[in-house]
């Protein structure tokens, strides 16, 4: 392998990372002159990386234990400067012969994108990033001008870091919780969007530390407080034509667009362990939290799991869906794969669009919700695990080894922590997903 020197100093380095089954980024670092090695050969990584839990326990399975070895190889085309002589790139997991491992979550998303392309459909995804600054001070008001200006130096440095890393940020504002921010990333291809989400969290974490703070990406950083979401905005086209506008269906949806919505709604109950599967997630995924706890869809309905953002002059990116239940404990590659895989299943099955729910579902009677087929998404550990184990879609998307790893990790975490008080869990895991 030819070593390659970058235009950097001797102490400069390259960090390559993956995201594991519990949503935590795991990484290895090479000196900058070893770039080609990191790309072509990679760093050693035990298959046990797939069964790391949120507390670093290893939830070994019959097929994933202390034996074997994989290679962590970075995607050179995604190499980005993150400051202080550090470049970062997303990595994939490969076996010793150079074949993509079935445990590689980035590879799972790539396969789903290819499956959509096989039926002529392309997707674009943009992520919302919610986080809470711990150690910040000052008065706070949701969407408050004073709240943003009070952290103006942090915001300015974050935007500079993003520009230097080639990360598109479209807006940033103060959120409902004290010292809570939300920023929106520019939409792009699905794999690139997940890479961008990981990069955004890196830059947010580094910038917060530089200002004497820490950024929490926990679903519930403070018990009883506002939760952090990770809403996923996704649009679909076929042969260049949008599926969610220009049709004769509700709000301009095409029949295919209706099938996308139907596929996602049908799949969501079986994918909760992937999208909202931390020991804190159930504290956020509740009615009244704008977290999409109800399994239904509606135009600009922020209590629905799937919010339709229709094509209007105020929506320059075009019609798209916001999948609201997802929280920051989710692996972004698996979350995007789950959503796109569900959409693919809806399209292949030509599923009909369910009835719209145009109001907050909590305002409906039990009988009205039953007539519309509206129910809360599962949040109990037993329900989440059983749904993941029995979901045909999850099996098709993730394969036996990765699903086995997911079930092992979530089973351990729920068993170990489900009885702990919310305040204890919020404090213990406040920075578990911080980079």
Region annotations inferred by a language model:
Residues 14-16, 183, 306, 323:
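Short beta-strand motif preference
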Residues 27, 35, 69, 128, ...:
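Generic secondary-structure boundary/loop-capping signal
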Residues 2-6, 84-286, 300, 322:
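Phosphate/nucleotide-binding catalytic core
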Residues 81-85, 174-177, 308-317:
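Short, ordered beta-strand-loop transition motifs
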Residues 19-21, 35, 77, 96, ...:
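Short, glycine-/Ser/Thr-/acidic-enriched flexible segments
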Residues 2-3, 199, 203, 213-214, ...:
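Catalytic-core signal marking the mid-to-C-terminal active-site face
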Residues 1-169, 174, 196, 372-435:
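ATP/Mg2+-dependent ligation/transfer catalytic cores
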Residues 27, 91, 227, 343-351:
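Glycine-centered structural positions embedded in regular secondary structure
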């Amino acid at each position: 392998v030819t070593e390659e020197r970058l235009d950097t100093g001797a102490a400069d380095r390259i960090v390559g990372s993956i995201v594991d089954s519990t949503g935590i980024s795991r990484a290895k670092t090479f000196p900058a002159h070893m770039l080609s090695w990191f790309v072509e050969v990679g760093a050693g990584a035990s298959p046990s990386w797939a069964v790391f839990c949120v507390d670093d326990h290893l939830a070994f399975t019959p097929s994933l234990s202390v034996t074997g070895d994989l290679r962590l190889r970075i995607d050179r085309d995604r190499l980005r400067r993150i400051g202080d002589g550090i470049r970062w790139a997303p990595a994939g997991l490969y076996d010793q012969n150079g074949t993509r491992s079935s445990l590689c979550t980035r590879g799972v998303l790539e396969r789903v994108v290819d499956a959509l392309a096989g039926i002529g459909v392309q997707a674009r995804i943009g992520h919302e990033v919610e986080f809470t600054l711990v150690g910040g001070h000052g008065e706070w008001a949701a969407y408050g001008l004073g709240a943003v200006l009070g952290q103006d130096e942090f915001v300015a440095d974050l935007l500079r870091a993003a520009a230097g890393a080639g990360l598109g940020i479209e807006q940033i504002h103060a959120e409902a919780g004290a010292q809570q921010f939300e920023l929106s990333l520019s939409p792009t291809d699905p794999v690139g969007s997940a890479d961008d989400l990981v990069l955004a969290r890196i830059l947010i974490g580094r910038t917060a530390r530089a200002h004497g703070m820490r950024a929490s990406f926990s679903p519930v950083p403070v018990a009883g407080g506002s939760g952090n979401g990770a809403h996923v905005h996704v649009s679909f086209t076929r042969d260049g034509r949008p599926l969610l506008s220009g049709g004769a269906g509700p709000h301009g949806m095409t029949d295919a667009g209706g099938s996308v919505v139907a596929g996602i709604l049908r799949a969501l109950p079986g994918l909760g362990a992937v999208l909202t599967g931390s020991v804190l997630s159930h504290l956020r995924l509740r009615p009244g939290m704008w977290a999409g706890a109800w399994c239904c869809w509606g135009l600009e309905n922020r209590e629905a799991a799937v919010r339709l953002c229709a094509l209007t002059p105020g929506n320059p990116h075009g019609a798209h869906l916001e999948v609201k239940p997802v929280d920051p404990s989710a692996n972004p590659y698996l979350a995007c794969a789950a959503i796109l895989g569900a959409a693919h299943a809806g399209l292949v099955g030509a599923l009909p669009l369910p009835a719209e729910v145009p109001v907050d579902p909590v305002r409906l009677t039990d009988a009205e919700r039953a007539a519309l087929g509206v129910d809360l998404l599962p949040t109990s550990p037993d329900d989440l695990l059983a749904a993941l184990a029995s979901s045909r879609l999850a099996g098709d998307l993730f394969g036996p080894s990765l699903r086995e790893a997911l079930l092992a990790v979530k089973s351990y975490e729920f068993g170990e922590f489900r009885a702990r008080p919310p305040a204890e869990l919020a404090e213990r895991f406040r920075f578990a997903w911080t980079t």
